[in-house]
Amino acid sequence: MTARKPTQDPPRAPAPVDSSPAISGLRYRKFFAALTRLQTDRPGAVLLVALLTVVLAGLAASRLTLRTSLSELLPANKESVIVAEQVSQRLSITSTLTIVVEGPSAEPLKRFVDALVPELQKLPPNLVGSVDAGVHESRKFFEQNKLFYAPLEDVEKVHAEILARYEHEVQKQAGFDLGIDDEDAPPPLTAAMIREKLDERTKASGAKDPYPGGYYIEPGGRLIAILLRTPIPAGDLDRTRDLLEQVNTVIARVDPKQFDLAMTVNFTGNLITAMEEYSQIKNDLSEVGVWGVSLILGVVFLFYMRIRVLVAMALSVAVGTMWTFGFTYLLIGHLNASTGFLVGIVVGNGINFGIIYMARYMEARRTSSIYDAALTAHVETWLATLAAAGAAMVAHGSLLVTDFRGFKHFGIIGGMGMMLCWIGTYLFLPSILALSERISPIPPEHGVVARLRAGYGRPFAYLAHNFPRVIAVTGVLLGLVSAALTVRYVLSDPIEYNMTKTRTVPKTGHTLARQLMGRVDKVVGRQGQDGLAIMVDRIDQVRPLRQALEARRAAAPEGRKPFDKVADIFDLLPKDQERKIQLIEEARDRIGRAHRRGFVSDSDWEEIQKHMPQGKLKPIGIDDLPEQAARMFIEKDGTRGRLVYIVPSTGRSVWDGHYLIEWAESFRSTTLPDGSVIKGSGGAVIFADVLLAVVEDAPKAILISIVGTLLIILIAFRGRPVALVVIATLALGLVFMMGTLSLYDAKLTLNGGLPSLTLVGLKLNFLNFIALPISVGIGADYALNVMQRYRLNPSGSVRDVVIETGGAVILCSFTTVLGYLALTSSINQAIVSFGFSAAAGEVSCLIAGVLVLPAFLRWREIRRARKAAESSAKTGTSEASSDAPAPEA
């Protein structure tokens, strides 16, 4: 059996006459002719306008700031955001600069701290709120009130010992001791006796003093910490640098080397880690953006192999990109975690319009003048590219219907970027080309360059031309399989609840500040870092709130407790104070009598006074607590006690989205017996709301993106049947994408010697979800351009369309995919997952638009030609074409 020669293109039936101005361009030809004349005759004036607008946009864009807080992703009117903001406004100093001093021995460290603290306290109050070098203040207070804080049982024991000894001494002095030996008598009234009784529990437990000498010093005495609390919010980089500069000046003046030549000073605390994290994120976004733009421009250069073309396209997309971020400043004012990496995406998608325009311009330039080539490119590409830009804008715009601020901002910037890049391309790219050709005309393509350009589309053209039925049928079958996988994926709850997979992981590991923070936490304690604050309006609401929360916890089943405990300022007050006061006063009275009667020496008397409360005794109140001990419960205005903390459950991770939702719901809203409602918020509630927003808003955004894109396709093709072909191609690409996501983490294992496939899809988070609606609009680009060029060239073959336009369309996909793949190098795992998801969508829609669609068109041509030949043979009006393609093997 001999091999069959490749089939030739069957003659295409003449395209129906189309008087539509949207397709023929006749109605708009005058407009494009005038525009092209201006662009090619006066390119300098046109580009001067471009330069002026770019400078203005650049000045605005340079003022954009980056906000990394998760609360920036939620709407400003979201209750959790409002409540969290209200709590933060009332919380006292929260930012901490920790000064970490290391040295070979403890005593020089303590002396240096004693010398440094007074100097730090002299710094301006707008920089330094307080300087905490240890627990000296709290220790002094609790030592003076040791009997109040001792367990009632211990106070009763001391009371009984004092009364018994006093009675023993009185009887002994009166001669009524009945010969009792001192060995059997109650212990003498000394300070040592009182101290010993109160310290029995501590000694029995074997607990060591966590703060030797009252300092925050590491066991072994090689590290000591000073906590400098400041009103500067974490993330205020300018004021943080100012504080560091002044603190360094003070440290240099005190000079640690005077105390020990080996002594070193470093910084940590949330003020430093926030600055590091901001810098890491900013640098990461910059690197990802530069890497993405470099890859995009590199692949464009490899397609055209002309520096001039690369520069022209780079300049035109730079105009649109600069406009985009200039308007971003005017409309929004900042970037957030969802929009900070959009530079590469805007460039990767925005350059596609220039690629399509340039491909047609270069093709026309072979036989036409600059003006005619530019006019041809205008007339023949504007509709397809505008439809693609509109579809992309609608896809991004679908995010505006959500309540999620991160989605809205992404939609505004992305959608605006697509349209502004289209405008920038069609306004200024022709002038850039015209000006460059005045200097030196672009030589026609030949040899390697021409073959290289054709090479982009040639593999697709070869497959679609020679195996149309196989490709089309395989595409449909894979689409059906992907659709089934998509249904399974959606029903399996694809939301990412493991929040560790959305955080930032530095490439270099933990910084010195992070390492020191871990060591300092072990010395100082986490000081409520895991708990969340709930704010009440009145102090009398604290107890009812606590009771309501504890009742809610008690009602939860074992193993599903939403939190461990509730903490308020009243936990810092001694218990059984009235009873203890009665016992202390009675004991103090007996000791006083014993001293006056000579039962207690003057030296013991003075020592005992240090352990006995002086003056008139009254219960210790919240205002009596030292500032250091009560700091967590003190508001900015000095009000105490209106803060209640709720501590997460032990053994349940605050990075588990399921638990976060449970925890958040347990204190989000609490109704007190008097009818007042207390709202809670914080990181847990905001995280939970982010997850819930993804679940609620994802279907809405996807539906609107699909509907909007379908309308644009129908409008672009005037509702003709070919629009349905484009829509079907887009649908095929989307199910390919979803099928790919559903297999993201699939595992093939052997079970009993038989292969077993476990399907685990990519989980959707607050960022990668965006890839779904935008892939709808951007993915329509490829099918739109191929079908439009196919209709405009009724005498051309599918193979020629794919080689010429398909090559440019493939390049468009490459630029977009590379922009997305650059995101996978990010240190933020949410951005990485978005990059993969969006790239999967691009590749899927490319395969559908540049391989399956041409294969279908080619197969349809063959079938139509065959039917026409059969019809002619039957009627006898014409002979079968001698070069008609033989049936496929």
Annotate each PLM feature:
Residues 61-104, 110, 202-215, 461-463, ...:
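Solvent-exposed, non-transmembrane loop/terminal regulatory segments of multi-pass membrane proteins
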Residues 299, 325-328, 386-429, 433-436, ...:
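Hydrophobic, glycine/alanine-rich multi-pass transmembrane helices and their short helix-loop junctions
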Residues 182-307, 550-553, 609-709:
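Extracytoplasmic
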Residues 96, 468-598:
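Juxtamembrane segments of multi-pass membrane proteins
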Residues 283-335, 401-405, 703-761, 825:
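Interfacial segments of transmembrane alpha-helices in multi-pass membrane proteins
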Residues 111-224, 239, 243, 260, ...:
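Alpha-helical transmembrane helix bundles of large polytopic membrane transport and channel proteins
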Residues 17-68, 431, 446-495, 824, ...:
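Signature of alpha-helical transmembrane segments and their immediate interfacial
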Residues 285-287, 314, 353, 366-402, ...:
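Pore- and gate-forming transmembrane helices of large, multi-pass membrane proteins
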